[in-house]
Swiss-Prot record:
The keyword Membrane applies. The gene is pstB. InterPro entries: AAA+_ATPase, ABC_transporter-like_ATP-bd, ABC_transporter-like_CS, P-loop_NTPase, PstB-like. It holds the Pfam family ABC_tran. Its EC number is 7.3.2.1. Belongs to the ABC transporter superfamily. Phosphate importer (TC 3.A.1.7) family. It catalyses: phosphate(out) + ATP + H2O = ADP + 2 phosphate(in) + H(+). GO terms for biological process: phosphate ion transmembrane transport. SMART domains: AAA. ATP binds at G37, P38, S39, G40, C41, G42, K43, S44. This is Phosphate import ATP-binding protein PstB. It is a peripheral membrane protein. Gene3D superfamilies: P-loop containing nucleotide triphosphate hydrolases (3.40.50.300).
Length: 251
């Protein structure tokens, strides 16, 4: 099966500072791909390049190609709004809107033109169920999303992404602000979601990458040192730098 996303010869710069160097990497469809590496190695920049979130940063510039279903998302005539509908993002800190739980999830569909209440009701319930949150909030949909626990807020943010029916979900350190129990819930949720979505996750947590992902790429100072099946990366790394990082010798 052709990868959902392919990165080919990508260099990325903030003004004159090069952050990514000749990256070639695949993101297989309906699989979880982890991007690991020490702080400042370019992980989040790489992830954000997959839906052009870096466009909003002054001086940001990408060379090379990022292909979604074999279409270069950096083509001049590409519809970026539609791209971000197809490739949704969950951030490090849960960031629910100061709105009701219902309105948080309905926000995207409304922006995209859905106005019929019965249809919004369906989308909100489906998305909250997919995010494993429905049973916890179904009787309190009118309450503020900010009143939820940290783990619930992050699942609400995942539901908000699911409501716009993406094909790819990007997760930038989605569990770093959560307790171990909430982290486990998110990891279990990821395994369920990959049945229907392609997932890319940035994580500092080696155990999480080993547990939750199918493929792993190791970045170091902007270079993709190694990429392959997660089991092989963690049990038989080909590069000594990979072995040193995953065993905690640096990072």
């Amino acid at each position: 099966m052709d990868p959902k996303i392919k990165i080919r010869g990508v260099n990325f710069f903030y003004h004159k500072h090069q952050v990514l160097k000749n990256i070639n990497m695949d993101f297989p469809e309906r699989q979880i791909t982890a991007i690991i590496g020490p702080s400042g190695c370019g992980k989040s920049t790489l992830l954000r390049a997959l839906n052009r979130m870096n466009d909003i940063v002054s001086g940001a510039r990408l060379e090379g190609a990022v292909l979604l279903d074999n279409e270069n998302i950096y083509s001049p005539n590409l519809d970026v709004v539609n791209l971000r509908k197809r490739v949704g993002m969950v951030f490090q800190q849960p960031n629910p809107f100061p709105k009701s739980i219902f309105d948080n999830v309905a926000f995207g569909p409304r922006m995209l033109g859905t106005t019929v209440q019965s249809r919004l009701d369906e989308v909100v319930e489906k998305s909250l169920r997919q995010a494993a949150l429905w049973d916890e909030v179904k009787d309190n949909l009118h309450k503020s999303g900010l009143a939820l626990s940290g783990g619930q807020q992050q699942r609400l943010c995942i539901a908000r992404v699911l409501a716009i029916e993406p094909e790819v979900i990007l997760m930038d350190e989605p569990c770093s602000a959560l307790d171990p129990v909430s982290t486990m819930r998110i990891e279990e949720l990821m395994q369920e979601l990959k049945q229907n979505y392609t997932i890319a996750i940035v994580t500092h947590n080696m155990q999480q990458a080993a547990r939750a992902s199918d493929w792993t790429g190791f970045l170091l100072t902007g270079d993709l040192v190694e990429y392959g099946r997660t089991g092989e990366i963690f049990s038989r790394p080909r590069d000594k730098r990979t072995e040193d990082y995953i065993t905690g010798r640096f990072g």
